[in-house]
């Protein structure tokens, strides 16, 4: 069974505009109850283009620690729901420490955690 924090290769095509596409790694961010019973799964895209602007919704992952082809970045602003049939093969899983970074970036992406106060 797939678990929250697992990294899979997934087929993200077709896409529109600035969405991440193609066959690429994704990290499962859906809870494990949903992973067990739902035909869909919530994931965040991973990119190997680490020269992208580092923003608070990005979490870096090292190739040597996570058995990836290159150092990569989880894009927690690129969250989407996929049919489980889009998942190809499990590559690795993230440590509890790394998942805490992912959780923080999700909080920021969804506005659950404010970076700075916004005064009206």
From Swiss-Prot:
Assembly with partners or alone: Forms a complex with MazE which is no longer active as an endoribonuclease.
Species per Swiss-Prot/TrEMBL record: Staphylococcus saprophyticus subsp. saprophyticus (strain ATCC 15305 / DSM 20229 / NCIMB 8711 / NCTC 7292 / S-41)
Gene: mazF
Keyword RNA-binding on entry: yes
Keywords: Endonuclease, Hydrolase, Nuclease, RNA-binding, Toxin-antitoxin system
Enzyme class, first EC level, given as a word: hydrolase
One GO term (biological process): rRNA catabolic process
Family: Belongs to the PemK/MazF family.
Enzyme Commission code(s) on record: 3.1.-.-
Protein name: Endoribonuclease MazF
Highest classification ranks of the organism: Bacteria, Bacillati, Bacillota, Bacilli, Bacillales
GO molecular function annotations of the record: DNA binding; RNA binding; RNA endonuclease activity
Short name of any one Pfam family annotated for the protein: PemK_toxin
Function: Toxic component of a type II toxin-antitoxin (TA) system. Ribosome-independent, sequence-specific endoribonuclease that cleaves mRNA, thus inhibiting protein synthesis and inducing bacterial stasis. It cuts between the first and nucleotides of 5'-UACAU-3' in single-stranded RNA. Neutralized by coexpression with cognate antitoxin MazE.
